[in-house]
């Protein structure tokens, strides 16, 4: 079976259209960045609440943020990554923390 589609014009001529390959969406890493003011417990809470990490995984990521300056929380399509960044940023500001959450292409 051919992957091309056949179309009939009003004049009964057959036209062939090449099938196009759909590219998978680009993925983006959501990244938490270290600061000197946001408590470690709050970072763990963010990781559990917005990224569904269990306490052990959240603690590992929090320690990586603390010691290495930043860490990836998850990898998502652009729209979901943007939403996660906005949610984390809003939640941090509501709780008066300067936690910086960004996204970068994976």
From Swiss-Prot:
Kindly indicate where the leader peptide sits in this chain: none
Q: Would you say which domain of life the source belongs to?
A: Bacteria
Swiss-Prot/TrEMBL GO biological process terms: protein catabolic process; proteolysis
Q: Which cysteines are joined by disulfide bonds?
A: none
| Reported function | Involved in the modulation of the specificity of the ClpAP-mediated ATP-dependent protein degradation.
Q: Which PANTHER family match?
A: ATP-DEPENDENT CLP PROTEASE ADAPTER PROTEIN CLPS (PTHR33473:SF19), ATP-DEPENDENT CLP PROTEASE ADAPTER PROTEIN CLPS1, CHLOROPLASTIC (PTHR33473)
Family designation: Belongs to the ClpS family.
Q: Which NCBIfam families match?
A: PRK00033.1-3, PRK00033.1-5
| Quaternary structure, from the entry | Binds to the N-terminal domain of the chaperone ClpA.
Protein name per UniProt:
ATP-dependent Clp protease adapter protein ClpS
Name of the gene: clpS
């Amino acid at each position: 079976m051919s992957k091309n589609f056949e179309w009939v014009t009003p004049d009964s001529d057959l036209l062939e259209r090449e099938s196009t390959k759909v590219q998978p969406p680009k993925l983006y890493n959501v990244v938490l960045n270290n600061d000197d003011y946001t408590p470690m417990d709050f970072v763990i809470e963010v990781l559990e609440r917005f990224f569904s990490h269990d306490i052990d995984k959240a603690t590992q990521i929090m320690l990586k943020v603390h010691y290495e300056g930043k860490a990836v929380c998850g990898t998502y399509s652009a729209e979901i990554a943007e939403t996660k960044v906005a949610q984390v940023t809003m939640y941090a500001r509501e709780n008066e923390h300067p936690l910086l959450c960004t996204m970068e292409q994976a």
